[in-house]
Amino acid sequence: MSNTTIGKFITFEGNEGSGKTTQSKLLYEKLLDNGIKAVWTREIGGTDIAELIRDIVLFKDMSITTELLLIMAARYEHIEKFIRPNLNEGKWVICDRFIDSTLCYQSKNSEEQQLILELHRKLLDNFFPDLTLIINVSPSIAMQRIKIREIHKNTNQLNKFDNRNQQFHQKITDAFIQVSKLFPERIVQINGEPMIEDVSSEVINIINNKMKVNLLR
């Protein structure tokens, strides 16, 4: 079930280095340029408490189950304190990661994915985005981009998921493809390997078609 509020809830998903954060922010800016009230947010995060949980999950070693429970707590806080209030005001909420990332990162198989979905339905009132865009890139390109990003940031603060090997990134890429098959009406996959401007144009095309708007490029 998608959200039943006035505004629209759009999420961006993808592997580390896919360009999803860049594309989500570009869409947010495009909405504002077109006179549409919008806010940008991210997971794990979006509220003071959720941001504290983010630092714990991204930089501390723990079991997948512990990660899952912390993320669910952060998401509940995020939905109740930020996402739903903004949607109720008629704003579009653009979010960098949501439930689909949890399905890919915090599960090992389809059975665990179903458990996560059951928790999501019971604890989070079956709250799903109106539309999800998965930005796909190959694991090798993802790892190249992670290295370039870190050089430009001039910092050693790679999180534990950035630091994983190519086999891990391949697993996440495959998981996103599988998750997209679970929600074909909600999820659209986009090739994230072309130039940023070309990917952004594809995002705008999809938003115009799916959300019945006419965003000017």
Swiss-Prot record:
It comes from the Bacteria. HAMAP family: Thymidylate_kinase. This is Thymidylate kinase. It is an enzyme of class 2 (transferase). ATP binds at residues 14-21. One of its GO terms (molecular function) is ATP binding. GO terms for cellular component: cytosol. Phosphorylation of dTMP to form dTDP in both de novo and salvage pathways of dTTP synthesis. PROSITE patterns: THYMIDYLATE_KINASE (PS01331). Keywords: ATP-binding, Kinase, Nucleotide biosynthesis, Nucleotide-binding, Transferase. InterPro entries: P-loop_NTPase, Thymidylate_kin-like_dom, Thymidylate_kin_CS, Thymidylate_kinase. Belongs to the thymidylate kinase family. It catalyses: dTMP + ATP = dTDP + ADP. Pfam families: Thymidylate_kin. One of its GO terms (biological process) is dTDP biosynthetic process. The gene is tmk. Its EC number is 2.7.4.9. The lineage of its organism: Bacteria, Pseudomonadati, Pseudomonadota, Alphaproteobacteria, Rickettsiales.
